[in-house]
């Protein structure tokens, strides 16, 4: 199975000409790569989009046990002071609860919708949208990563 990975590096626009893409085979070997329209690779079923780190906000929250069942309802308000936009203007994604802690990623809904519309113009329907930071190894505590912007 092939996979298409598209990186959006521009923080200003989501114009197709500013995308870097790579098509990978099942062993993660590069089949093709380029910039802008991925052509035939746009029809790939497994599409992942990498957003610029500056477009997301990450937070680690402590959630009371009673609130866990209503996580999706209370997250927007738990992060209200730190959001990029008002609660109804953000898209939130919560990670797996680990004890009483949960990781949350936020992105402005307008930006995400605009990007998805631009991708649809190329017949691209991503299965995943993640930050470029999510691609860094996180299993080692003795390594630091620096992102230059």
Tell what function each PLM region has.
Residues 1-149:
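Hydrophobic/aromatic-enriched cytosolic interaction surfaces used to assemble or bind macromolecules
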């Amino acid at each position: 199975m092939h996979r298409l990975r598209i990186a959006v590096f521009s923080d200003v626009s989501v114009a197709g000409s500013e995308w870097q893409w790579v098509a990978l085979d099942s062993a993660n070997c590069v089949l093709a790569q380029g910039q802008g329209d991925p052509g035939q690779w746009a029809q790939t079923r497994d599409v992942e989009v990498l957003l610029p780190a500056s477009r997301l906000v990450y937070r680690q929250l402590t959630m009371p046990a009673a609130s866990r069942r209503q996580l999706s309802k209370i997250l927007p308000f738990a992060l209200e002071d730190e959001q990029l936009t008002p609660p109804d203007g953000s898209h939130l994604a919560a990670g797996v609860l680990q004890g009483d802690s949960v990781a949350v990623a936020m992105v402005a809904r307008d930006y995400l919708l605009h990007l998805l519309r631009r991708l649809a113009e190329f017949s691209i329907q991503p299965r995943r949208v993640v930050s470029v930071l999510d691609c860094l190894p996180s299993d080692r505590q003795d390594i630091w990563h620096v992102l230059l912007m």
